[in-house]
Amino acid sequence: MSSAMPDPVPPRLAERTADLLVERLAAFPTAVRAMVERLSPEEGRWRPSEDDWSIVEILGHLIDEETADFRDRLARLLDDPDAEWPAIDPVAAAAARNDRDRDLAELLASFEKARSESVSWLCQRLAQTPAVEWSLAKAHPRGDLAAGDLLASWAAHDLLHLRQIAKRLHEMLDAVGDPFRIGYAGEW
């Protein structure tokens, strides 16, 4: 077996990582909308088990993360690295708001609005923030967390939930497809 080195990072990515991450953040709502906008209310609320979130609960979580986690924490870190971050509990927040009974279209619109505000804020920050400030860091239970780490994690968080939505749709198709089977598509 060859021990080939991975391809080098494309120059565009290496030279303008923050800009590229903001572009990815801006594109995410379109991907989510394409996956969920035609779901019925029942499909949006469907869970494969009581321990799993439905798609509407995932959307509620994305709104929380948009407003109470990533944007808020990044702003606090850039403006006052020593400021404390409010605690967040995504599972408790979803339960307290009863996200499962919320309207999918309204949640999607709320998420798109919140993300648009975040992207506008990020574009303004990128225009005024020197690159060195992306290395500002804060002690965190998972280790020191730099502003750039938080920005990259925000974009990665989107992909985790895009995967989660795709999995939920796959599970739903498997559950409702009877008598038809989906095994020919391949393993999940």
Per-region residue spans from a language model:
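Solvent-exposed interaction patches of small proteins and small membrane subunits
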Residues: 13-16, 20-23, 47, 79, ...
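Short gly/ser-rich anion-binding loops that grip negatively charged ligand groups
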Residues: 22, 60, 64, 108
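Acidic/histidine-rich alpha-helical segments that form the ligand environment
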Residues: 24-28, 35, 91-133, 149-154
